Curated annotation (Swiss-Prot):
HAMAP family: Exonuc_7_S. It holds the Pfam family Exonuc_VII_S. It comes from Bacillus cereus (strain ATCC 10987 / NRS 248). It catalyses: Exonucleolytic cleavage in either 5'- to 3'- or 3'- to 5'-direction to yield nucleoside 5'-phosphates. This is Exodeoxyribonuclease 7 small subunit. Heterooligomer composed of large and small subunits.
Length: 76
């Protein structure tokens, strides 16, 4: 998977693959290929999101102290 894709481009490609698979008229071999590509795109998006979360944690930290990112719903 090309890592030079932007997050938005990767999401768009992932949505396109999901749409093809949801139609249900895709030959099995092609469906497997789409699924593998979709998993790679999903991993790429996850990596990009984690990178942004790390950057935001640094940016939003008080007095230069790194504060961990807490997603909504993760608070205990």
């Amino acid at each position: 998977m090309e890592n030079k894709l932007s997050f938005e481009e990767a999401i768009s490609q992932l949505e396109h693959l999901v749409s093809k698979l949801e139609q249900g008229d895709v030959p099995l071999e092609e469906a497997i290929s789409y699924f593998k590509e979709g998993m790679e795109l999903s991993k790429l998006c996850d990596e990009k999101l984690k990178n942004v979360q790390e950057q935001m944690a640094v940016i939003l930290g008080e007095d230069g102290v790194l504060e961990p990112f807490t997603a909504l719903g993760d608070e205990a």
